[in-house]
């Protein structure tokens, strides 16, 4: 079972002082052990001295009686010092162990909180990135070439719409393709017909199209889960869609749907690999983006195949960290959204394996 989830304010700036405290605690443990061992050696010498004195006093007979009394006192003192030494060792060991445990707990909390901050950083960057996609699709759905083609489909209007979409793609390289569809889900034109021959393709059953066909205004948008797009040669995409409306007006009559296919894999990989993990931690630390279905949709350890899952023990918290029984620390942060983009229930996750 994982240990309890913790959450709290950033404490990354305390990491150095905690590290110094751990070092001081270890130095104290070593110093105390050396001093106690020294006392025990002196006590042993006193006991040996007392024993030798008792032997010599016995040999001296009547003349050694006084010395015998002194030897007995020395032996008693040695015994008392030995007892005090043992008690001191037990008490110091217990206190140093407690201090060490508290210090390690503070270090773990600081590390966990920093990991949560990194998880937030990853999900915030992708949220801001995808927010821009929602703006793009709603804007481009009002382009006159797109509106004209959706309203009156001819070979000429489709060719011009395709050309216009191609111009947009040349400026926005994060997209694989842009598709203009009619209200029945048929692709009318796309921006890269030389690369993707999708004109006439039926996308009526695609989740993003089903959502987009139900939109009530041009101010709204639809989005599908990260998926592999057969029409785009099996590339992983994040597809955003908006309704194309008469006159490019927000509440004009619906004419069709514009879908924009964000080139997911390379963009997501750049984000997760860009999270600032300390060099000495990189070999045992993974940065993940996990969707609402707990699918791993991006990983710093390699391109995700979208068929792996990672269960997060959130404890109904938006963020936090916990330690598994094998010593692995998991930190997470739910999508906070950005501006009008509420996010899709994703999480940024940092996984740090134990030594």
State what each model feature region is.
Residues 3-26, 106-109:
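Short, charge-rich amphipathic alpha-helices with coiled-coil/heptad character
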Residues 27-55, 87-97:
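Alpha-helical coiled-coil
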Residues 161-171, 257-305, 314:
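Solvent-exposed, extracytoplasmic
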Residues 190-261, 321-323:
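Extracytoplasmic/periplasmic ligand-binding sensor regions of membrane-associated signaling proteins
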């Amino acid at each position: 079972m994982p240990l309890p989830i913790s959450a709290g304010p950033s404490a990354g700036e305390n990491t150095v002082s905690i590290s110094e405290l751990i070092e001081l605690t270890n130095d104290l443990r070593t110093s105390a052990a050396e001093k106690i061992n020294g006392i025990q050696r002196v006590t042993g010498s006193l006991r040996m001295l007392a024993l030798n004195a008792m032997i010599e006093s016995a040999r001296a007979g009547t003349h050694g009686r006084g010395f015998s009394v002194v030897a007995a006192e020395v032996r008693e003192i040695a015994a008392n010092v030995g007892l005090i030494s043992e008690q001191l060792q037990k008490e110091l060991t217990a206190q140093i162990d407690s201090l060490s445990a508290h210090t390690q707990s503070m270090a773990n909390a600081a590390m966990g909180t920093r990991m949560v901050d990194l998880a937030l950083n990853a999900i915030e960057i992708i949220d801001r990135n995808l927010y821009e996609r929602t703006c793009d699709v709603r804007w481009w759905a009002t382009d006159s070439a797109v509106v004209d083609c959706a309203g009156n489909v001819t070979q000429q209007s489709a060719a011009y719409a395709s050309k216009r979409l191609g111009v947009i793609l040349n400026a926005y390289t994060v997209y694989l393709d842009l598709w203009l569809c009619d209200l029945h889900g048929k692709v009318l034109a796309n921006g890269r017909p030389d690369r993707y021959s999708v004109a006439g393709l039926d996308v009526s059953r695609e989740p993003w199209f089903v959502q987009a066909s139900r939109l009530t205004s041009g101010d709204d948008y639809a989005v599908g889960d990260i998926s592999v797009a057969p029409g785009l040669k099996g590339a992983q995409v994040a597809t955003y869609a908006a309704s194309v409306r008469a006159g490019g007006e927000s509440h004009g009559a619906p004419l069709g749907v514009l879908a924009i296919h964000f080139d997911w894999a390379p963009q997501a990989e750049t984000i997760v690999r860009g999270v600032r993990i300390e060099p000495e931690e990189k070999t045992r630390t993974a940065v993940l983006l996990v969707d609402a279905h707990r699918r791993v949709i991006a990983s710093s350890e390699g391109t995700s195949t979208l068929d792996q899952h990672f269960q997060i023990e959130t404890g109904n918290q938006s963020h936090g960290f916990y330690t598994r029984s094998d010593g692995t620390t998991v930190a997470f942060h739910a999508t906070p959204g950005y501006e009008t983009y509420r996010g899709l229930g994703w999480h940024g996750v940092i996984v740090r394996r134990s030594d």
